[in-house]
Structure formats: C-alpha cells, structure tokens
Design a protein with these regions (language model features):
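Conserved beta-strand positions in repeat-built beta-propeller and related beta-rich domains
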Residues: 135-139, 179-184, 221-225, 266-271, ...
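Short loop/turn segments that connect beta-strands within beta-propeller blades
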Residues: 148-153, 191-195, 233-236, 280-284, ...
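A short helix->beta-strand "capping" segment at the edge of beta-propeller domains
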Residues: 99-119, 150-156
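C-terminal motif of bacterial Sec signal peptides marking the signal peptidase cleavage site
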Residues: 14-15
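Beta-rich, blade/repeat-based domains predominating
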Residues: 119-130, 163-174, 204-216, 248-262, ...
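Beta-strand-rich domains and repeat architectures in extracellular enzymes and scaffolds
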Residues: 112-144, 159-171, 324-326
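Solvent-exposed segments in extracellular or luminal domains encompassing
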Residues: 66-78
Length: 339
C-alpha cells in the first residue's frame, strides 16, 4: 500500500497538469456560410499552436488561403485544415453551401395540341422513341410499362409490374428500357422491342427511385432529394451525384426527368404549383422555372386527379408533351420566355 499510493498520486498529478489540445476553428471570411461563384475565401485558423504548417483542402483538393470559387458543382463544400508540427498532425473541418449565381429565368407554355390520355394512368415516366411514346405508371398493383400511340392514346404493348412494385421513371438507351421502382431499391431493364425483362439492378447510395433520363452516354436518376445521380449505362451503378440548387437554397423533390439539348427538364413538387425546372447537369444550377399553371384545369376533374408529372420531348416535332397523374389529356406544348 505504501508503494501504490505515491504511484497513484504521481499519475494524477501528471494527468491534471497535462495541457489540453488547443481548439481548432477555421475562419472563412464568409457570412452565413453561403457562397456563389466569384466569392473569395479568406482562410485562417484560429488556434494557439506554434511552429505549425497548415494546408487547406476543398472537397479533398488542396487550395490556397484565398481560394476563388469558379465553376465548382453547387451544393455542400467541405473545407478541411490539416495542421502539422513537431508533435504530429491534427485536422478540423467545416462546410459551406455553394448557391447558384443568379435566379432562374421564368418560362411559360403555349398549347399546340391535346390528345387523349388514360385517366387511370398514374404517370411516373414519359419518353419518346421516334413517334412511339413509352409510359411508366405507378401505384402498387397498378404499375405498368407500356407503349402508346400518342395521337390516340391507344396502348400498343403493356407490361404490368408485380404488385409488390411501385413503378417510377423510365428512359431508353442502347435499345433497352430502364425503369425505376420507388422504395424497392431496385430498377428493371427491358428489351425495347418486346418489353421482356432482361435483368434488375439495385440502388446503393440513392435510396429511392423517382425520375430517369439519359444523355446518350450515362443515366441521370432523381431520388426525391435535391440530388441527381449519374449512373453507369451498363452496370447502372451510381458513379457520383450533383446537387440541384437555386440562388437561395437546395431544390428538393426532383421528380420525372427529360434530357433536352444538354439540359435536364424536371417535374418537381416545389412551390405548390404545377411547375417544371431546367437544370444545368454540369453544375446543378436551376437555370429556369416553367410555370404550367392552368393545364390541370383543362383536364377532366375527378376525385383521383393528381399533380403534373410526365414530360417528354419529341425530337422531330421539337415540342414537349406533358401530362399528369390520372390526367385525361396529354398536351403538346412549346416552352417560351415569360414576359
């Protein structure tokens, strides 16, 4: 006991007398942690560490203390500082939000034609292949993949999904149809000519299936958040994602997608209005908002009538076709600047 007590006292003395590690805090010189392209960081480290070397990183890429934001993809920006001195390394990290530089432009529509659309179709995906219209519909027990004569609404081919699946967006690439399901963490690949299922694929990072389109090389998938995921065209694995942002905030609830002339046109549940947005896929910038107000009032009004959802571009006619969940009409429109 005589030996143990002095030893314990010595250990306690060392512990109590040991200096604590200095608190590290990054100063950015940015108000509200929100930036746009053209803004300059003024990075400093608030600490009391002596004889140190500091390296700053933006999304794991080394940057200078006075970094200027230029064309980075929008959304969350992670800034890390790694401090090195004779005693080793320490690090600290903060996040900023990179917003769009300018507000989106406003657009409206001009109706050219209206065509019959099955009032029982809970539309989730819409895309043309030549003059043939492909449609994916939702709801458990009612979900289908079908081809249509867009002028008459006649169903040419119909492939029901198992009642356990809730159908979502679709797109056509390399003579294959790719269709999403909502919460089953699974998509399906079909032979375009026959609608025969070839295989399925899992979701990994993206937890739900909403909208789908392609640029001829890769697929773009929405999951109900403000992210659009880029998928490998062969394995359908998520390669990376972009964050969809306005000049004020992230834009969530991105739904049905269509690729047109290098931009993504997307239906969305934002704003409590019948709107679509135009997205720059390289940055995530919302470049335009299309106000489709008034279209819903032109279809048959009934108890199951639901929101605008379904946008397809006809490459030959150079017009858009839009409809909604349980809408009785399919509208052919042009999109024009709003005055």
């Amino acid at each position: 006991m005589k030996v143990i007590l002095p030893l314990i006292s010595f250990i306690l003395l060392l512990t109590c007398g040991s200096p604590s590690k200095p608190i590290l805090k990054i100063s950015t010189g940015i108000k509200n942690n929100k930036v746009v392209w053209g803004d300059t960081l003024q990075l400093k480290l608030k600490d009391k560490i002596e004889n140190k070397n500091i390296q700053f990183y933006l999304n794991e890429r080394p940057i200078k203390k006075n970094h200027v934001f230029t064309n980075e993809p929008l959304g969350t920006q992670r800034i890390k500082a790694i401090i090195t001195n004779d005693y080793g390394k320490r690090s600290t990290e903060i996040s900023l939000t990179l917003l769009a530089k300018a507000p989106p432009k406003l657009f409206t529509y001009n109706i050219l034609n209206s065509f019959p659309h099955k009032i029982t179709s809970y539309t989730q995906g819409l895309e043309f292949d030549g003059d043939l219209l492909y449609e994916s519909t939702g709801l458990n027990g009612q979900s289908t993949l079908k081809t249509l004569d867009f002028k008459t609404g006649e169903v040419i081919n119909n492939k029901p999904l198992d009642e356990s699946y809730f159908g979502e967006g679709l797109t056509i690439l390399n003579d294959k149809i790719i269709q999403l399901t909502w919460k089953s963490m699974k998509g399906f690949v079909y032979e375009k000519a026959t609608l025969a299922i070839q295989k399925s694929f899992p979701y990994k990072s993206s937890k739900e299936g909403w909208g789908l389109c392609n640029d001829g090389k890769v697929l773009y998938k929405s999951d109900g958040s403000n992210r659009i995921w880029i998928l490998d065209p062969t394995t359908y694995k998520e390669l990376r994602s972009i964050e969809v942002m306005t000049h004020k905030a992230p834009l969530h609830n991105i739904n049905e997608l269509e690729w047109v002339d290098g931009k993504i046109y997307a239906n969305t549940y934002q704003f409590n209005k019948e709107v679509s947005v135009i997205i720059d896929p390289s940055s995530g910038t919302v470049e335009g908002v299309i106000d489709f107000s008034g279209l819903k009032e032109l279809v048959e009004q009934h108890s199951q009538l639901n929101v605008l959802n379904g946008i397809a571009y006809h490459k030959t006619r150079k017009t858009f076709f839009v409809t909604g969940k349980n809408w009785s009409k399919l509208f052919e429109v042009t999109i024009e600047p709003k005055e």
